[in-house]
Amino acid sequence: MSLKLEVKTEIKLDYQGFQNQINEFHKRINDKNSPDINFLGWNNFPEVAINPQEIARMRKIVENLHQNSINVLVVIGIGGSYLGAKAALDFILGLGPFENKPEVIFLGNSLSSTDLYQKIEYLKTKNFAINVISKSGSTIEPAITFQILYQFLIDQIGEKLAKTRTFVTTSIKSGELLEIAKSNELEIFEVIESIGGRFSVLSSVGFFPLLFAKINVDEIIQGAIEAHKKYSTSSISQNLAYKYALFRFLMYKNFNYKTEILISYEPFLIYFNEWWKQLFGESEGKNLKGLFPASAIFTTDLHSLGQFIQDGSKNFFQTIIYIKKPKFDLGIKKLVQFNSKINKLSGKTVSEINFQAFLATTLAHSSYGNNPNLVLEIADSSPKTFGHLVMFFEKACAMSAYLLGVNPFDQPGVESYKNELAKNLGWDR
């Protein structure tokens, strides 16, 4: 998979002055004696992240579910426990709607009673299974949802059958969810201790939902392996992941930009953008430091945010993901019933016009709007490309956080709201 990176800005950037720092942090990411080795399982790929025996077990389970007409999987999880899988499904399949295909529904990522109620109403007519994902089981959103949905499944089909349709992805060492799974004799998949949630899509956390949806997980793994090798050098000129990390750092530190907007030209990248926001937001946003990760989908958001991006305050830069080959395309035919200027576009395809919009917008924002633009061009939206892009961003994120002087692998600020909520509820986490 080819990934191209192009910077469009008048700002002069000196990358080579940082090579020694990059070398130091590269060693920290890759050295087996790194002080952060207990958080680097995602980078020990595929040896630590991939469990072939567990994937084989998942395949058999999925095959059995499909043979028994279980056509809906409800994934219960929040943050990294669902964003990666949702991003992958949309990236690879598109947004549909789909007929006669396995469906994956995501719950437990909010405390909305309305959303939960409406999805349960939908499930009343479906044959469904549950995959609850939580390292410990003490996160309130998925914990509540699992309790409600598991009871609903028992009411629908009985406890004995419900146990055969409920799958738990959690730590195999300890935790409340592990104890629940064991005491109820539920199937368990492993959350690897050395892989944090936001880095976990290329592991069992992401693979079971993807296998259920008949995604080619082997191709995802192959794409990630290729990216892992490609971005294994410390050379800034040869490692685009590190070059992207350094570009972000320079925008923040040397030129005082506070926000990075990740822009895509395909609606099916909405949740990829959300995954990226968690990856960088939780990894960098600490010690009063870090770029605020925002996102937009063009051309849709050009009709809401376009004015601000062009003429508003200049505290942001843009990173653009552009997919060279669309999944599908449509030609525009002349319609004699319409006496319209749009008829002049007949003979073109929708993707050709989208590409011209990308070129025009990038020029307008970078040249006339004075917004630095970094373009990441990818070949397609295949499973292999997804695996490659995830590994690219994960490596870039670790380097970017180290350059910033923060720990990429903790998220102490998230605990603050959790602890206060537990106090309000009188709940012992």
Curated annotation (Swiss-Prot):
Annotated active site: 282, 303, 418
One GO CC term, this protein: cytosol
GO molecular function: carbohydrate derivative binding; glucose-6-phosphate isomerase activity; monosaccharide binding
Catalyzed reaction equations: alpha-D-glucose 6-phosphate = beta-D-fructose 6-phosphate
Pfam families: PGI
EC number(s) from the headed UniProt entry: 5.3.1.9
Keywords: Cytoplasm, Gluconeogenesis, Glycolysis, Isomerase
GO biological process entries: gluconeogenesis; glucose 6-phosphate metabolic process; glycolytic process
CDD domains xrefs: SIS_PGI_1, SIS_PGI_2
Pathway stated in the Swiss-Prot or TrEMBL entry: Carbohydrate biosynthesis; gluconeogenesis; Carbohydrate degradation; glycolysis; D-glyceraldehyde 3-phosphate and glycerone phosphate from D-glucose: step 2/4
Chief location: cytoplasm
Functional summary from the UniProt entry: Catalyzes the reversible isomerization of glucose-6-phosphate to fructose-6-phosphate.
Family: Belongs to the GPI family.
Entry protein name: Glucose-6-phosphate isomerase
Organism (species): Mesomycoplasma hyopneumoniae (strain 7448)
